[in-house]
Amino acid sequence: MMEKNKRVLLGMSGGTDSSVAAMLLLEAGYEVTGVTFRFYEFNGSTEYLEDARALAARLGIGHITYDARKVFQEQIIDYFIDEYMSGHTPVPCTLCNNQLKWPLLAKIADEMGIFYLATGHYVRKQWVDGNYYIAPAEDVDKDQSFFLWGLRQEILQRMLLPMGGMTKSEARAYAAGRGFEKVSKKKDSIGVCFCPLDYRSFLKKCLCDESGDKNRNIYRKVERGRFLDESGNFIAWHEGYPFYTIGQRRGLGIQLNRAVFVKEIHPETNEVVLASLKSLEKSEMWLKDWNIVDESRLLGCDDVIVKIRYRKQENHCSVTITPEGLLHIRLHEPLSAIAEGQAAAFYKDGLLLGGGIITMSDQR
């Protein structure tokens, strides 16, 4: 078994959070090595690489760069596209953290003989009744626990999370107070790293640009389709079903005398059903690909909280396992716009119990 020494491998993005994490780990007496992953470079910019290298040099810590663009394309971006083509609403940041970023960090650390792993995530870790749990950050506005429900004990036991007890404003002040003015003023990243502004523009570029990478067979013809009401009556034409998500109201390109929202997406017919917000409420859902730290804390309990969106929509629920191996969630109060492909995360007593991917939901 690897010795638990004071060496730690830190994921460094070049941003404020991972930079401050490096400083905090050094102050705590750790020997820090930084690794910057090349996952995706928006508009081809590599400024983040130079920023991470420069910070590592200034702090006097080791630094390496790891090119993961191919695996990121295959596991994250292609999944993202495939999910929308299936009429689902993916959460790529959840998949990336649980199946790529943290496992890759562990793999590199193993090769270097390093036990501890760290990032600039705003989360905490707790040891309760023989298990490690992720816990929400002190800064509720920056808390990222929702994205980490898929991590297992072999990763959790190695994690160091120096940002969990700090707010973002405190992190900026901390960096500025130590002479890292540029670090303290870096902008926050917003949204998905490979399409931070609008996923529809990204999808259209991937799906509809015949001049794209034909070796990857990304180009797929997307034609206009029909908006229907709940009775199957034609309302208007739409641009193509992949460009809509469950619960969407804005950007439909139609004007009606009532508010309507996307209720159903049918890839096989290229039809999108619109309905009132009330009609989107559901009181049940099922999860696949789930991970739970300790099932006894979740199953049969009525005080579990489930979240289906980062920072939004939480409710109390009860959870059982179906004969098919899915998690069946019964909500105490209906939630609106539950979409297949989204993630759901469970919380209880201030701990992240686990989560899974929504595979289907029923009407109230």
Swiss-Prot record:
It catalyses: S-sulfanyl-L-cysteinyl-[protein] + uridine(34) in tRNA + AH2 + ATP = 2-thiouridine(34) in tRNA + L-cysteinyl-[protein] + A + AMP + diphosphate + H(+). The record marks 121, 342 as: Interaction with tRNA. ATP binds at residues 11-18, 37, 120. It is found in: Cytoplasm. Residues 142-144, 309-310 are annotated as: Interaction with tRNA. The keyword ATP-binding applies. InterPro entries: MnmA-like, MnmA-like_C, MnmA-like_central, MnmA-like_central_sf, Rhodanese-like_dom, Rossmann-like_a/b/a_fold. GO terms for biological process: tRNA wobble position uridine thiolation. Disulfide bonds join 96-193. It is an enzyme of class 2 (transferase). The active site is at 96 (nucleophile), 193 (cysteine persulfide intermediate). GO terms for molecular function: ATP binding; tRNA binding; tRNA-uridine 2-sulfurtransferase activity. CDD domains: MnmA_TRMU-like. The keyword ATP-binding applies. One of its GO terms (cellular component) is cytoplasm. Its EC number is 2.8.1.13. Keywords: ATP-binding, Cytoplasm, Disulfide bond, Nucleotide-binding, RNA-binding, Transferase, tRNA processing, tRNA-binding. PANTHER family: MITOCHONDRIAL TRNA-SPECIFIC 2-THIOURIDYLASE 1, TRNA 5-METHYLAMINOMETHYL-2-THIOURIDYLATE -METHYLTRANSFERASE. Catalyzes the 2-thiolation of uridine at the wobble position (U34) of tRNA, leading to the formation of s(2)U34. NCBIfam families: PRK00143.1, PRK14665.1, trmU. Belongs to the MnmA/TRMU family. This is tRNA-specific 2-thiouridylase MnmA 1. It comes from Bacteroides fragilis (strain YCH46). The gene is mnmA1.
